[in-house]
Amino acid sequence: MKGRGTHAMSSKKNNLPKNVSVEMVDPDAGIWEATATIDNGDFGSRTLRFETGLLARQADGAVTAYLDEDTILLSTTTASRSPREGIDFFPLTVDVEERMYSAGRIPGSFFRREGRPGTDAILAARLIDRPLRPTFVKGLRNEVQVVITVMSIDPNEMYDVLAINGASASTQLSGLPVSSSVGGVRMALVVDEEHPEGQWVAFPTREQVSQSVFELVVAGRVTEPAKGGRGKKSQPNVAVMMVEAGATDNVVERIAEGAPAPTEAVVAEGIEAAKPFIATLCAAQDALRDAVDTESREFELFPPFDEDVYSAVEAECDADVAQIMTIADKQERDESLAENMQETVDALIEQFPERESEIRAAHNDLTRTIVRQRILEDGFRIDGRDHTSIRDLGIVVQLLPRAHGSALFERGETQILGVTTLDTLKMEQTIDSLGPETSKRYIHHYNFPPYSTGETGRVGSPKRREIGHGALAERALTPVLPSREEFPYTIRQVSEALGSNGSTSMGSVCASTLSLYNAGVPLKAPVAGIAMGLVSGLVDGKEKFVSLTDILGAEDAFGDMDFKVAGTSEYVTALQLDTKLDGLPSEVLASALGQARSARLEILQLMEDAIDAPDQMSELAPRITKISIPQNKIGEVIGPKGKTINQITEETGANISIEDDGTVFVSAVGGEAAEAAIEKINAIANPQQPKVGDRFLGTVVKTTAFGAFISLLPGRDGLLHISNIGGDRRIEKVEDELNVGDKIQVEIADIDNRGKISLVPVDED
């Protein structure tokens, strides 16, 4: 922390990279701090600090992480003292707590306190979990909880990648059995006048991201150092574990101005550019761990099975499983595999009493081995395809008659229904988070009901996985959406996963493009997505990598990589990668990207055959007309306490939204209602001065003892005196002839020097 003396670490300091330091900042309290400096060349440098010993001392591991000075978060890692019984998985939980005080704000909820995590917090938690989970030793069954608390944030910064590093650092100090530290970095390809070809900037600010064409988050760990040449210091090898990437909102406009398009080659360059920064961050975390001298704790491990069980299972059912894994139909294959597993359990349970879970785990591992071996040695996939083929595609557009847009996209047994709903800008989603956004115009929701996999389960509020898949599809489509000015609608896109056997998120991208076109949304370009996989292993003593196009669910589970790529025919709009390997060779990644592009182009062609341009908007969708009024007339159009605008809405049935710059959006399902509302708005904002002799069909808005006030135009009333109401007859009460809301034909008889209008009735005959 600031204001304290420092005490340099005496050991291992000379072995640190020059941009990493570690020191004791308070010897009495035992507070240590490691610092990593990120050099961005022309774009300056960033400083990340990891401090331990001051906050949350009772947690197993606690680190306060700083990005420069103003962005601070606390990461804690805590483990239960005993294993959780009755489970066969590692119970890791990652929670992100966004404290509104970190931005100097009070929560907008009724109780004025933080509630359940918002979308940003959930996505950040997933971003941390994905690279952190694989570092834990297999067989751990103790509950582990990582909690990230955002304590201070610069409004121009993003905290999620700092949280990846903080979570890894606190886990390193917890004494838990992990293989290595994890470093995470956000990279943005910033294009400006000084860098027309773009420069990759690490830990960019929000302002720098707005100047970029592509951003990506890369997480990885350091493996064995690479061998340096004679006289050269060896450089660490960085194994990429996770990538989350997407094009920026303005990528189409920036490319038109001459900026480089984020092609597959450019994306691969960005991933490579991230590796030195990851190595620096891992070095800082390791230095802090070594300085604190954390003791490793002993944990009981529960391997899924012992070798004797696996050998028995292999001897019992190897040939049967090999035959079953040639069945192309998912349901038939799953049923046959389940039956074979039960038969194997029945056959071996006497030999291995009370070890049924081991038999089942060994059966699963045998299945995995058979599938991988066939792919590597024979080029044979479960459903008979080669490694570059796409499953059969099916497309149906305008499936739902009352929806504004809909489309069904099928890829093999994966079936996605995309549904588009359009509404006025008043329906934008209000956002109460730490980010600068206060509203969102494009909303993408993804639903994954249990019946999509033939199972039962909970339905209702979305799970973290559904929120993550929806965010990925949203990221893929946002760069090609029309601007507010071009298309002044709020767009809600829903992806219904009706059947799942591999990459429903990429199926959602395809279904959404088709549905948006069907709704009449003028996309800048169609977008399609494909899921890739990877299987690696030794064949004839040599390491072999096989990239798989359009993976099945089983290939996802048994493979080494889940790699999703979405984009147009020209560039990538979204990418997500998770790998289980210690390292992904650059040439393998480049090959997989190229293979994904070929598949994407094939899918885009089939989508174009189904619908190649936006359809006419549905008659059920609101028609929105945009007009402009002088800013000094906004108050008159709204009226006191909204009286005038509410009156126009009530009389015409149109919805009206007024922006601060005088832009007015008028929407109605029927065109006549919108035209009537526009006419009334123009009458106020650009009025024609009423003159004696003008006639109007007015509305009674108020009655008094001396007459009735008649609304002629919005904001302009006239008085029909009681003496003129009855014609030749004398009336005692205005209400005997007229009441509020009545329509009456009147003529302007006089306008005095104060602008007061006197009216006389007009004989309708």
Swiss-Prot record:
GO terms for biological process: mRNA catabolic process; RNA processing. Pfam families: KH_1, PNPase, RNase_PH, S1. GO terms for cellular component: cytosol. Its main location: cytoplasm. GO terms for molecular function: 3'-5'-RNA exonuclease activity; magnesium ion binding; polyribonucleotide nucleotidyltransferase activity; RNA binding. Its cofactor is Mg(2+). It catalyses: RNA(n+1) + phosphate = RNA(n) + a ribonucleoside 5'-diphosphate. Mg(2+) binds at residues 556, 562. It is an enzyme of class 2 (transferase). Residues 622-681 form the KH domain. Disulfide bonds: none annotated. Its EC number is 2.7.7.8. The keyword Cytoplasm applies. Residues 693-762 form the S1 motif domain. Keywords: Cytoplasm, Magnesium, Metal-binding, Nucleotidyltransferase, RNA-binding, Transferase. It is found in: Cytoplasm. NCBIfam families: polynuc_phos, pppGpp_PNP, PRK11824.1. PANTHER family: POLYRIBONUCLEOTIDE NUCLEOTIDYLTRANSFERASE, POLYRIBONUCLEOTIDE NUCLEOTIDYLTRANSFERASE 1, MITOCHONDRIAL. Belongs to the polyribonucleotide nucleotidyltransferase family. Involved in mRNA degradation. Catalyzes the phosphorolysis of single-stranded polyribonucleotides processively in the 3'- to 5'-direction. This is Polyribonucleotide nucleotidyltransferase. It comes from Corynebacterium urealyticum (strain ATCC 43042 / DSM 7109). The lineage of its organism: Bacteria, Bacillati, Actinomycetota, Actinomycetes, Mycobacteriales. The gene is pnp.
